[in-house]
């Protein structure tokens, strides 16, 4: 029994260095991410791109693949809920990546009700720990 327990402890210890490499990047507890424009419940004209401005406090913005303390890059979520916080943020038309360190973008959406939310990702597009995300806002394109 002792040999079995010792073997299990040894095997688990071999996994520890690997588990530490892929974990989320730490974020300060007072980090604050927000959408500066458009405003919640704002009506925007259809057929015309509009600016989305990203705001971040108590952290910095760095391009993807740059691992530096207290930095990350923006992901704009359109008409979706937050993804799993322990996995890479999807990259599709509802999860826009700004891996060059952008702090604003132009978006054009079809007429209707839409939601926008920001999520900060680390150098590997994984949400920080604790996750840093904005309030979800609603906009209307008419």
Segments from the language model and where they lie:
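Bacterial N-terminal signal peptides
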Residues: 7-17
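Short, compositionally biased P/S/T/A/G/V-rich stretches that sit at domain boundaries
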Residues: 23-47
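A glycine-anchored, Pro-Gly-centered beta-turn/N-cap motif
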Residues: 48, 110-112
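Short amphipathic, basic-aromatic surface patches that mediate peripheral association
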Residues: 55-66
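Short coil-to-beta strand junction motifs in C2/discoidin
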Residues: 66-74, 133
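Short acidic/polar inter-strand loop motif in beta-rich domains
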Residues: 83-85, 121-129
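Short beta-strand elements
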Residues: 130-142
